[in-house]
């Protein structure tokens, strides 16, 4: 199986959007629908779903996921991690959409009430230590051992090295897009990613670049679709 670094994945994302001309909103919707597919195919307790969204494209995926769940009648709460006024335009656009659905994001949610947490805080772009406040929140969430589905990469995991950037949210399942990431198969990242499912959302294939992509044998449980 081909594995990519965070930088290689970013190049693929940029080429797909900027050169090929695939709208970012299309990729976000496909990513969100992929996560919905995984939720529907799994045996998860869906009584109360909490979506934790960051301020970048990973957060935009999370907002779209919350909308799709809400539209299907699920009890879903959306909470932003960070000041939403500083969010990327992709997040703000998704917010405009969910407001028309009548879904309002919460200022703060009780982790204890959630039966399933969707981690859409940070994706593959993380390369620094998480803020101290977020580290504390993650440690608290890990302590109560809730079932977590990570969007693309568990928050706190370096997608290239598998190292923890201060703290990392432990996932039961990680739905990653396009190609599996090296960091989801190595070091503690391989453990904290849980069951990794690779979903095709229409990104450009690495074969179109001069990448030297490593193969990783004996990696953790990985499924593709």
From Swiss-Prot:
Residues 9-209 form the YjeF N-terminal domain. The lineage of its organism: Bacteria, Bacillati, Bacillota, Bacilli, Lactobacillales. Its cofactor is K(+). GO terms for cellular component: P-body. This is NAD(P)H-hydrate epimerase. It comes from Leuconostoc sp. (strain C2). PANTHER family: ENHANCER OF MRNA-DECAPPING PROTEIN 3. Catalyzes the epimerization of the S- and R-forms of NAD(P)HX, a damaged form of NAD(P)H that is a result of enzymatic or heat-dependent hydration. This is a prerequisite for the S-specific NAD(P)H-hydrate dehydratase to allow the repair of both epimers of NAD(P)HX. It comes from the Bacteria.
